[in-house]
Regions:
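Bacterial N-terminal signal peptides that target proteins for export
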Residues: 1-9
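Acidic/histidine-rich, surface-exposed loop or edge segments in extracytoplasmic proteins
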Residues: 86-100
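Short, internal acidic amphipathic alpha-helical interface segments
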Residues: 108-132
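A short, structured loop/turn motif at beta-sheet edges
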Residues: 78-79, 106-110, 146-152
């Protein structure tokens, strides 16, 4: 039996309203393109480590450190792997690495997800929906990026979750955009809870497993001359720098940080060493190479579809 993301309707009426009132760009219903990987009747999509669908967050009033280490909320890769953020622990201090998890869909599962996305009717052309800026300040943009059926489409929506689905359109926002908030909110919720509606046959693996990255970006900062961070009475946690390089010369300086932070990429054996190191650390752990100098290290796992290089942050939003 064909299943789709729960609660979705075809939104031709919404698209018509958006197009008529200028609430966002909208195209016609997507063509029936097929012949994709593994299913001649399915929706074509990338294979391997290329991304099919990514849900990310950009902008918002956040520190540059958060901006640099922010991770997508959801990634579906061409090989069926789904990578997302798992449950966060309440312990203090928290673990140094984010709790990323992964599980693999079958081709049937990929098609179930893509069918649900297509049936929203929204992924026909790039759209920016910014009307909520008139009612919510400093919110983030939720960005859906889809590569399927021979198209690459990006939908960016400001303040997703901040617009009640039954509200009258505020100034600067069309009724079509209000409905788009409702539909994309449902889509987002469905993607974050795949287990609740996908059949068992949609999964190649039985359960979620911790995601172990093949590469990480490390943001290293010399904090030797800074006062200790208040750890709530906990003793300072200092570990030995695990490699032979000089922490003070690690990577390249990230000027946009404004505090001497340096960024470099570790992979291969070095990446495995640092993954083990960061897995044993907390958010308050410091590292030393001589007993006197102190360095903070923040790791940002690199996902399979991403360029591992440290990104240029100047002008980011």
């Amino acid at each position: 039996m064909k299943r789709t993301l729960p609660g979705y309707l075809v939104v031709l009426l919404v698209l018509t309203a958006c197009a008529a009132t200028g609430g966002g760009s909208a195209g016609t219903s997507p063509p029936d393109e097929s012949g994709g990987s593994g299913d001649s009747d399915g929706i074509e999509h990338p294979t391997g480590t290329d991304a099919i669908l990514v849900v990310d967050s950009t902008g918002g009033f956040v520190p540059v450190q958060f901006m640099a280490t922010r991770l997508p909320a959801f990634v579906l890769l061409g090989d069926g792997r789904v990578i997302m953020q798992g449950a966060q622990t309440l312990e203090f201090p928290g673990p140094a690495l984010p709790a990323l998890i992964e599980r693999t869909l079958t081709e049937e599962g990929i098609q179930e997800v893509l069918s649900g996305v297509e049936e929203t009717g929204l992924f026909t052309a790039d759209v920016e929906l910014n009307g909520a800026q008139n009612m919510v300040a400093d919110a983030a943009n939720t960005v859906f990026t889809l590569d399927a059926a021979g198209r690459e489409v990006t939908i960016s929506i400001y303040g997703l979750g901040a617009v009640p689905p039954d509200m009258e359109p505020p100034p600067g926002m069309t009724s079509g955009e209000v409905q788009a908030h409702r539909i994309l909110g449902q889509l987002n919720d469905g993607l974050m809870t795949l287990d609740s509606w996908l059949p068992a046959s949609a999964w190649e693996t039985e359960g979620w497993q911790p995601y172990e990255p093949e590469a990480m970006r490390l943001y290293v900062r010399d904090v030797t001359d800074e006062p200790p961070v208040d750890g709530g009475g906990l003793p300072e946690h200092v570990r030995e720098w695990p490699t032979e390089d000089d922490p003070a010369a690690f990577g390249d300086e990230e000027v946009f940080f404004g505090d001497g932070t340096r960024c470099g990429v570790v992979d291969g054996e070095l990446g495995a060493t640092w993954f083990e190191e960061m897995s044993a650390a907390t958010q308050m752990t410091l590292w030393t190479d001589d007993g006197d100098r102190r360095f903070s290290v923040v790791a940002r796992p690199v996902l399979p579809h991403e360029d591992p290089a440290c990104p240029e942050l100047a002008g980011a939003a």
